[in-house]
A protein has these predicted regions:
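Alpha-helical transmembrane segments and their membrane-interface boundaries
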Residues: 1-84
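Interhelical loops and loop-helix junctions of multi-pass membrane transporters/channels
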Residues: 13, 77-85, 89, 102-118
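Alpha-helical transmembrane segments of multi-pass membrane proteins
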Residues: 35, 61-65, 92-99, 142-146
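C-terminal ends of transmembrane helices
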Residues: 35-47, 95-108
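Small-residue-rich segments of transmembrane alpha-helices in multi-pass membrane proteins
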Residues: 56-66, 90, 114-127
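Ligand-binding beta-strand-loop-alpha-helix segment within the catalytic cores
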Residues: 69, 85-95
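Loop-to-transmembrane alpha-helix initiation sites
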Residues: 83-84, 130-140
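Residue-level detector of conserved catalytic or cofactor/ligand-binding positions
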Residues: 144-154
Length: 154
């Protein structure tokens, strides 16, 4: 057991990069806030997915990108860095599909929630890659689109 803990501590010291770890933590916090804001807005409107779901999706996508960067830095990864992002985007489609229902009257419900989850994953990828301008612009546009769609129709 002591030998195992020694190996773990050695690995932590060997691969520790304090600056990278601080940046990674910052990115996850930003993702949590951005995803949480979108989720809170959806929750306040009584939609099926809310604060926790959107925060988790955004943080998860961010973490996937951070992990991708970590692997590339520490293990000489010459692989395609965009591959992880592509897998997140396609994988989130399955989660979004679970929110879509077609009622007995052929009315589709949950489509906007699915789209919002998808775009939140894209925000997480953006944050995980360190592209904050794109992420913050995306959050602003999401709120603008959400408000525009809530106006009364004549």
């Amino acid at each position: 057991m002591v030998e195992f803990l020694g190996d773990v501590l050695y690995d932590l010291k060997e691969f520790s990069d304090t600056r990278f770890e601080v940046v990674a933590l910052f990115r996850m916090i930003v993702a949590s806030i951005c995803g949480g804001l979108i989720g809170l807005e959806r929750e306040m409107k009584g939609r099926p997915a809310g604060l926790k779901t959107f925060s988790l999706v955004c943080v998860g996508a961010t973490l996937a990108m951070i992990t991708n960067e970590y692997i590339s830095r520490n293990f000489g990864g010459s692989g395609d860095l965009a591959r992880m992002a592509a897998q997140v985007i396609s994988g989130i489609g399955f989660l979004g599909a679970g929110t879509i229902i077609v009622t007995g009257t052929n009315q589709v419900r949950g489509l906007t929630t699915a789209a919002a989850l998808w775009v939140t994953a894209a925000l997480g990828i953006s944050i995980g890659a360190g592209f904050y301008f794109g992420a913050f612009g995306g959050v602003g546009l999401i709120f603008k689109i959400g408000r525009a769609s809530c106006r009364e129709r004549v």
